Design a protein with these regions (language model features):
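N-terminal beta-loop-helix "entrance" segment that forms/cooperates
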Residues: 41-54, 256-257
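A conserved, positively charged/aromatic
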Residues: 93-106, 119
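Short N-terminal targeting/anchoring amphipathic segment
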Residues: 51-66
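Active-site proximal beta-strand in glycosyltransferases
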Residues: 74-88, 104-107, 131, 150
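Short, polar loop motifs at secondary-structure junctions
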Residues: 64-69, 88-91, 109-113, 134, ...
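Nucleotide-sugar donor-binding catalytic core of glycosyltransferases
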Residues: 8-18, 120, 124-291, 313-315
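Catalytic binding pocket for nucleotide-activated donors in carbohydrate/polymer assembly enzymes
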Residues: 4-11, 17-30, 34-39, 98-99, ...
Length: 383
């Protein structure tokens, strides 16, 4: 088995790091990989030579279907194309509409399987493959960790974000705002469910083709609900006297008055974020809107020896046990989160036990290398 893996660009090269670990998984299972990195100024020439020359390959692999974004390049693909999505499919609508055969897609949320089948029926194979995590060789012992609570992630002010909709024509603005507001309370609904509900209330019927376009056009809703809960969680902690070290872009827009407790730092590189996790007792996670999926931050937190405290997803509840390998909190009961955090800060040995169990479980089952092995097994099975 031979494959071509294309490494694109991303903020802090984070996707490149994930891909390099996935490649190790491919190679462990005996697959020969030709890697083409966009960081190489001659990457297009190398790609063209590989696709049109005598190099024999069985599949092409990349993250988020990036190569499908080239208008003509995909027409030269001679074998199966595998796109590993790390976001909701609506962010990659135009790429997913390409008609290459065979076209394989993996997704990080089980809800997205039904979404892809419904709106992109031309896709040949679809599989749920969750994120993985990355650890370090050396991490600090739990009792010696200097950071009590760590939060990593960017910030957008949800109030200001919603004000942006005032520029939008009235009917569409009401649809967007009403969908955002229903997701604030229906925390287990997907964006698609909420939007379909609002369309039904307006007696508007959409074809699947129209709906996939609308979802792609209204990613604002997904961005808003992520921003809303990120703000709510951090604000609630500050108001209740929980000290949090926050790293990420945009937090200068946070208008809370809890500067004694919410300590805002500049954004850091991905590798620096791993070092911070290795110095933290608790790493707080607010899931992207993946109701049956995963996020790499959960696994990476565990692999770096911190206690992961995260809101729930159906998948995470399937693979981890609450208060054994991680600690869940509920978006509907964010007011209980300060007490939950304080409970584990006060019980150092209990927190350490959960952190170690999570580390062991994630290192065994949830590395990016492991995902590479799972992916290759699937590609071979479907050949």
């Amino acid at each position: 088995m031979r494959g071509i893996v294309f490494i694109g660009t991303s903020q802090y090269d984070v996707l490149g790091l994930f891909l390099k670990e996935i490649i190790k998984g491919f190679e462990i299972n005996g697959c020969e990989i030709l890697t083409i990195d966009r960081a190489n100024e001659n990457y297009m020439d190398l790609l063209a030579q590989a696709l049109t020359g005598e190099y024999e390959y069985d599949f092409i692999f990349d993250i988020n279907g990036i190569l499908m974004g080239h208008d003509r390049l995909y027409t030269f693909f001679k074998q199966k194309y595998v796109a590993f999505l790390v976001d909701h499919p609506m962010y990659h609508h135009k790429r997913l509409m390409r008609q290459h055969k065979p076209y394989y897609v993996t997704t990080i949320d089980k809800d997205h399987i039904d979404y892809l089948k419904k709106y992109y029926p031309h896709l040949d194979r679809i599989k749920f493959v969750p994120h993985g995590g990355i650890g370090q060789d050396r991490i600090e012992e739990y009792k010696n960790r200097k950071i009590d609570v760590l939060f990593l992630g960017s910030y957008e002010n949800p109030k200001k974000k919603l004000e942006y909709t005032e520029r939008i024509p009235n009917g569409m603005r009401e649809l967007i705002v009403d969908t955002c507001k229903i997701l604030e309370t229906k925390t287990q609904w997907t964006m698609e469910q909420a939007l379909l509900y609002q369309l039904e209330m307006r007696q508007l019927k959409m074809t699947n083709s129209d709906m996939s376009e609308i979802m792609s056009d209204l990613v604002f809703i997904d961005e808003y609900i992520r921003a809303y809960y990120r703000d709510k969680v951090i604000r609630t902690l500050g108001e209740n006297g929980v000290t949090v070290e926050v790293y990420g872009n945009g937090w200068e827009e946070f208008d809370g008055n809890q500067t004694d407790f919410i300590h805002i730092h500049e954004s850091v590189s991905y590798m620096e974020s791993l070092e911070l996790m290795g110095q933290a007792k608790i790493v707080l996670n607010v899931m992207p809107w993946f109701k049956k999926g995963s996020h790499e931050r959960v696994f990476t937190t565990m692999m770096n020896g911190a206690l992961c405290m995260t809101d729930r997803s159906e998948y995470l509840e399937e693979v981890f046990t609450d208060k054994k390998e991680l600690v869940f909190y509920d978006l509907k009961e964010v007011e209980k989160l300060p007490g939950l955090i304080q409970e584990y800060l006060n019980q150092n040995e209990k927190a350490k036990e959960i952190a170690l169990a999570g580390k062991e479980k994630s290192e065994a089952d949830h590395t990016w290398k492991k995902r590479g092995q799972e992916l290759l097994d699937w590609i071979v099975e479907e050949s």
